[in-house]
């Protein structure tokens, strides 16, 4: 509830949706000031039995412009925030130098899988494709 309210207030504060890094920085700062702890998906899984009362899992699916994700990761790093970045294995997203740079900032890297869609619903092909792609990461 509070997160929805914060997002609404920040993004609509200027009368229109604003998805700039400046506004994202404000959102992260506001959540931090309200006592929210940020964690990666892996941290969430590890802490399940003892999660803090207020927490945010930041998960980013990198679909198109990987450079934008690097800029987002840099903002998070400056604020001491860790996030999870899931990359597709397509040219727009799969840029190893950017993936390494985001990982070097301390963020979690994962495979944004879409194997069933790629395999057109064929489970055997999807599993084989998944194993191939997962080995990449």
What is the predicted role of each segment?
Residues 1-137:
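Catalytic alpha-helical scaffold of carbohydrate-active enzymes acting on polysaccharides/glycoconjugates
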């Amino acid at each position: 509830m509070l997160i929805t309210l914060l997002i609404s207030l920040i993004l609509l504060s200027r009368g229109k949706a604003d998805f700039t890094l400046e506004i994202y920085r404000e959102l992260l700062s506001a959540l931090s000031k309200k006592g929210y702890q940020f964690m990666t998906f892996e941290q969430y899984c590890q802490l399940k039995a003892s999660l803090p009362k207020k927490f945010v899992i930041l998960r980013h699916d990198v679909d198109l412009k990987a450079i934008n994700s690097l800029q987002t990761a840099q903002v998070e790093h400056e604020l001491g925030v860790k996030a999870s970045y899931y990359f597709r294995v397509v040219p727009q997203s799969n840029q190893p130098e950017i993936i390494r740079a985001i990982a070097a900032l301390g963020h979690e890297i994962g495979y944004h899988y879409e194997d069933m869609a790629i395999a057109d619903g064929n489970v055997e092909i999807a599993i084989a494709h998944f194993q191939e792609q997962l080995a990449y990461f």
